[in-house]
Amino acid sequence: MHQGVITFSRNVFLPLTTVCQNHCGYCSFWTPIQKGCIMGREQVIETLRLGAGAGCTEALFTFGERPEMVPGFSEHLAAIGYSSILDYCYDLCKEALRFGILPHTNAGVLSTGEMERLREVNASMGLMLETTADVPAHQGSIGKSPAERLSMIARAGKLRIPFTTGILLGIGETTRDREESLEAIADLQREYGHIQEVIVQNFCPKEGTPMADVTPITTETFCETVRMARAILPEEVAVQVAPNLADAGVLVGCGANDLGGISPVTIDYVNPEHPWPAIDRLTEVAGDAVLRERLCIYPQYITQGWYPPSMEPLIRSLSIKIQERSL
């Protein structure tokens, strides 16, 4: 990423289900199985249509990890004609491409075979590391094993999948834990070269969760961690912060250079109490830096051809579109 440039992606957020095998102490995204626990195809299509009309270039597909492991969920899947949430996601990624929007899927820990299949219809993928530490917030969350998550990130590297990961601050980890987490990500990047951005995200307490009364990190600690990330991560890896969760203008001054996906159409379903800033206000966050729109696949991976050949016309077309919007 060029110095003095702050980037963002224009996206739509599509939470296909909030059912999850994990029960993290800080999460309000999780819900029990109930009617409507799967986002219907019609709603997805309508959201994609609105996103395309608003100039969105990224469809963020996310959902609870391994929801089929939760008793009763498979019946809801069967009712819409599927036996696997990943099969459903695959088909909806194809719909996104049909609307001219590039899919980016974050589905939790996946096997090599599952990633190989999803990469056919995704321009990039992601998985938050969160932390390498064993923290109480992850008790009862089988999918939050740091070793399992690091292993998946490595497998994505072997498959040459442009990848997003990140750390979560304020869930019981120490400063040294943050450093170790960033060092682990940096090591994977040096080995495989596939990590395009690392999210440094602050935990925001949610009412009704076990960690509702936990004090969030201070702006000073957040800024120190962003500086740490910039110092530890290879230069080509963007440091991303969410402008709806913190004072991103301050964090840009500490070394952050990406604002992540911002949607003119959908809310942040993980943090619904924190609305996105309007895209035309992002220049205020960027300050003296140049604000530049990007795709969910970063330019260096486009140059290297790290995408399915079938996506090339769309990637080229969208690259031109965002360049024209920046003029």
Curated annotation (Swiss-Prot):
A UniProt-annotated Pfam family: Radical_SAM
Record-given protein name: 7,8-didemethyl-8-hydroxy-5-deazariboflavin synthase
Organism lineage string: Archaea, Methanobacteriati, Methanobacteriota, Stenosarchaea group, Methanomicrobia
PROSITE patterns named in the record: RADICAL_SAM
Names of required cofactors: [4Fe-4S] cluster
Gene Ontology molecular function, alphabetical: 4 iron, 4 sulfur cluster binding; 7,8-didemethyl-8-hydroxy-5-deazariboflavin synthase activity; iron ion binding; transferase activity, transferring alkyl or aryl (other than methyl) groups
Family: Belongs to the radical SAM superfamily. CofG family.
Documented EC number(s): 4.3.1.32
Coiled coil region boundaries: none
HAMAP family attached to this UniProt entry: FO_synth_sub1
Residue ranges constituting the Radical SAM core domain according to the UniProt record: 6-244
Catalyses which reaction(s): 5-amino-5-(4-hydroxybenzyl)-6-(D-ribitylimino)-5,6-dihydrouracil + S-adenosyl-L-methionine = 7,8-didemethyl-8-hydroxy-5-deazariboflavin + 5'-deoxyadenosine + L-methionine + NH4(+) + H(+)
InterPro entries: Aldolase_TIM (IPR013785), CofG_family (IPR019939), Elp3/MiaA/NifB-like_rSAM (IPR006638), F420 (IPR034405), rSAM (IPR007197)
Cofactor comment text: Binds 1 [4Fe-4S] cluster. The cluster is coordinated with 3 cysteines and an exchangeable S-adenosyl-L-methionine.
Keyword field: 4Fe-4S, Iron, Iron-sulfur, Lyase, Metal-binding, S-adenosyl-L-methionine
Binding-site residues, [4Fe-4S] cluster: 20, 24, 27
Function statement: Catalyzes the radical-mediated synthesis of 7,8-didemethyl-8-hydroxy-5-deazariboflavin from 5-amino-5-(4-hydroxybenzyl)-6-(D-ribitylimino)-5,6-dihydrouracil.
SUPFAM superfamilies: Radical SAM enzymes
SMART domains, sorted: Elp3
